[in-house]
Amino acid sequence: MIASMQRPARRTSSSLLVLLLCVVMVAATSCANRQKGVEYEYLRLTVDGQETLGIAGKDKLIRAVVIYFHDAGDDEFAMTADEPHSAMTSALVNAGFAVVASKASGDAWGNSVSQRNYLYVGGTAAQHYRTESVFFLADGMGAIAAANLLATGPTVRVRGFAAINPIFNLKAVAPQYESTVARIYPSASIGSKNPMELPPTAFKFRDMRFYSNPDDPVVRSDANARAFAARFGSTSSISVVDCASKDGNASCYQGDDLVKWFAEQEKRS
């Protein structure tokens, strides 16, 4: 399993001769970690001014890039922050996917700056790992940016969008997030970035899969994952997996199921 990573106090630098639009790779490190016969390679770089982390199998043909959109209070290290995240990321990397995450302005709640960053991250990752196939994987708050990018037509080829306890309604966030959302989105502008207010055909022909805990008091499934499926499901393919258990939301990080679903999308497109 991929070990939990912490923000390094000191970083070894090596130049990367890549320049893409506003993307400047200013520093990167890579290291290998052998676990259960799998060797991982970590890439550290800066994209659009934001720290970014990529994890892939060393010397392994990359079948697709998975762009991970982190939750509130997290950053690019979230995909290895604890056992559920680490196990999910390991399953994806072991199956041949490169998983890439960005700090993306922290608690940006899908604002224009974070969307631009993720757009550049997708293009940079696809170029670096030499693949045209990209999947979106969002966690909580990250679904706001992911959904908006998917609706506007990203420059990369997105084969599928998966999300874990996704937040899709900026007007129905938990009380602890209300002040942050209000600061980022004055009342007159929130509708332009709120996925639940997009036209019903905004995700036409898109394939999506959501892992949602119906008992989660912070991210209510009926106001987010299932409400989103009800609004957009007539023109797109959306499946919602209930993942409630005594371990809280940990059971929603289903790496093996993600690998299976991503593989199904690869066959379809």
Give names to the regions the model predicted.
Residues N33-K60:
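N-terminal cap/lid segment of alpha/beta-hydrolase-fold proteins
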Residues D48-E51, K58-A91:
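Short, surface-exposed "cap/lid" segments of acyl-processing enzymes
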Residues T89-A108:
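Conserved alpha/beta-hydrolase
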Residues A108-Y129:
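Alpha/beta-hydrolase active-site loop
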Residues K171-G233:
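The feature captures the conserved acid-bearing segment of alpha/beta-hydrolase catalytic domains
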